[in-house]
C-alpha cells in the first residue's frame, strides 16, 4: 500500500510540474513548481535553472531519473539542497 501511495505521489507530482528547454544546451526552466513536498529519500540530485528563465527554480532529480521543478524559496527545498551538498 505504501509503495502504491509513493508511486501515485510521484506520478501526480510529475503531472503537476513542467520544464521547458531553453536554447540548444540542456538548460531547463520551471514553468510550474510542485505543489507538494517530495520525500527526501526519493531525491538524489538537483540543479538550478538558467538565469535566462523568467522564473527561478530548482530541478530535483528523483531516483527514477524524473525531473521535478521546485520553488527555491521553500524551506524544504533549501534543506534538500544543503543536505545534497554535504553528501557530495
From Swiss-Prot:
Disulfide-bonded cysteines: 29-53, 30-69
Keyword Signal: yes
Gene3D superfamilies: 2.40.50.40
Family (UniProt): Belongs to the intercrine beta (chemokine CC) family.
UniProt keyword terms in alphabetical order: Chemotaxis, Cytokine, Disulfide bond, Inflammatory response, Secreted, Signal
Matching CDD domains: Chemokine_CC
Gene field: CCL18
Pfam families with a match to the protein in the record: IL8
Chief location bin: secreted
GO cellular component, one term: extracellular space
GO biological process per UniProt: antimicrobial humoral immune response mediated by antimicrobial peptide; cell chemotaxis; chemokine-mediated signaling pathway; inflammatory response; positive regulation of cell migration
Localization, UniProt: Secreted
Protein name: C-C motif chemokine 18
Origin species: Macaca mulatta (Rhesus macaque)
Nucleus keyword on record: no
Amino acid at each position: 500500500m505504501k509503495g502504491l501511495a509513493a508511486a501515485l505521489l510521484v506520478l501526480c507530482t510529475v503531472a503537476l510540474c513542467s520544464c521547458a528547454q531553453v536554447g540548444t544546451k540542456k538548460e531547463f526552466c520551471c514553468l510550474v513548481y510542485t505543489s507538494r513536498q517530495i520525500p527526501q529519500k526519493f531525491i538524489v540530485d538537483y540543479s538550478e535553472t538558467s538565469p535566462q528563465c523568467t522564473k527561478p527554480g530548482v530541478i530535483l532529480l528523483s531516483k527514477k531519473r524524473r525531473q521535478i521543478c521546485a520553488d527555491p524559496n521553500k524551506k524544504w527545498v533549501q534543506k534538500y539542497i544543503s543536505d545534497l551538498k554535504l553528501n557530495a
